[in-house]
């Protein structure tokens, strides 16, 4: 039996660098049954296989038009079915992932880079992009979320529940653990699950972020006293949660002074007007006050991005370029960032960033006065 596996996002997104967990579980399942399994790097290889599994996470990842589900071709993932994506069969869903599925592809990428860079090739720095493939055990301890946010793909469940024991996907030879849980803190068994992670003595992270609104003293004390890997990531999606998030930030700062606290900040969802821009800056100002970093998320509905049709399109771009680069966000106000872009502009007139700022300031001077000159480094904990 020859099984082909296609990670559609790997093929269709040039800079995509994260393993597809479903692909790894399917590979592990079939290898245990003696099948020959291969990660396909071209859709042209489908003909050489008895069965092919194609998984896609992102809705805008392109695939050939002729690819259709059949007895031979099995397709799954949110990229195809959004919130209606069918579950894997239990025997596959709860199988140990094959963490070596991508090994041959990684080695090919290394050899290609060596051939191009020659003596200048630095393998250690080159391999950083593959760290999730090589260093992490990856999986879900819990599944589900009760929030039902309209912008979120996670609509299948209305509660959070234990999904897999850690041992189901934990490889002790790997350096770290990456959790893909939808809303870990929403599970009533969060403390027991956290204790199992701590017991491994391995650094771990929640890639999908954590629900700031559920932070309590006990949760904060538990979270900020572990070997955490990288930034603690939360979400500040709605300005309507401003007072609640403010309260929770105070709790966080009782237990950690770390600046490795980051928030996803959703923009362009409820509207793409001046009020949405103001609401974005209002949230960013609060995060600055508590020395947290933002990551601006411009809303995309499958393949449709409303902000791209907004009169403030250039301002949304500038906002993300400023907010999503910590080295810049920490040192420059929004106005300083726009002025720095203008200083690099080589033709007459204003660059798009400076022009967008000036036009908005002319239209909404009160908002500009309140927020455009705020600087992260001016706030102290």
PLM features: residue spans?
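Conserved C-terminal portion of the radical SAM core fold
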Residues: 60, 177, 227-232, 240-322, ...
């Amino acid at each position: 039996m020859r099984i082909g596996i296609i990670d559609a996002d790997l093929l269709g997104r040039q800079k995509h660098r994260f393993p597809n967990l479903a692909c790894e579980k399917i590979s592990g399942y079939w290898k245990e049954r003696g099948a020959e399994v291969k990660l396909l790097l071209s859709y042209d290889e489908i003909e050489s296989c008895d069965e092919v599994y194609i998984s896609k996470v992102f809705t805008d990842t392109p695939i050939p038009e002729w690819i259709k589900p059949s007895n031979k071709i099995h397709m799954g993932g949110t990229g195809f079915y959004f919130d209606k994506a069918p579950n894997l069969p239990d025997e596959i869903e709860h199988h140990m992932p094959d963490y070596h599925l991508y090994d041959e592809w990684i080695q090919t990428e290394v050899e290609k880079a060596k051939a191009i860079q020659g003596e200048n090739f630095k393998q250690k720095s080159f391999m950083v992009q593959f760290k999730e493939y090589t260093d992490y055990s990856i999986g879900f301890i819990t599944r589900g979320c009760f929030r039902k946010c309209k912008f979120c793909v996670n609509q299948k469940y209305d509660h959070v529940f234990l999904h897999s024991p850690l041992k189901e996907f934990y490889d002790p030879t790997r350096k770290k653990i990456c959790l893909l849980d939808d809303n870990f803190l929403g599970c009533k068994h969060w403390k027991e699950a956290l204790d199992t992670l701590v017991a491994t003595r391995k650094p771990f992270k929640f890639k999908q972020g954590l629900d700031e609104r559920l932070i309590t003293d006990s949760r904060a004390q538990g979270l900020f006293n572990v070997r955490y890997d990288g930034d603690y990531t939360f979400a500040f999606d709605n300005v309507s949660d401003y007072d609640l998030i403010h309260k929770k930030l105070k709790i966080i700062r009782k237990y950690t002074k770390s600046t490795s606290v980051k928030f996803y900040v959703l923009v362009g969802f409820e509207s793409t007007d001046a009020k949405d821009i103001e609401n974005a800056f209002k949230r960013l100002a609060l995060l600055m006050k508590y020395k947290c970093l933002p990551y601006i998320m411009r809303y995309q509905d499958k393949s449709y991005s409303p902000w791209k049709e907004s009169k403030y399109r250039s301002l949304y771009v500038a906002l993300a370029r400023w907010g999503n680069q910590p080295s810049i966000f920490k040192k420059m106000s929004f106005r300083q960032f726009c002025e720095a872009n203008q200083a690099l502009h080589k033709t007459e007139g204003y660059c798009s960033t400076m022009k967008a700022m000036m036009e908005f300031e002319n239209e909404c001077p009160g908002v500009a006065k309140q927020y455009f000159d705020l600087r992260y480094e001016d706030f102290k904990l």
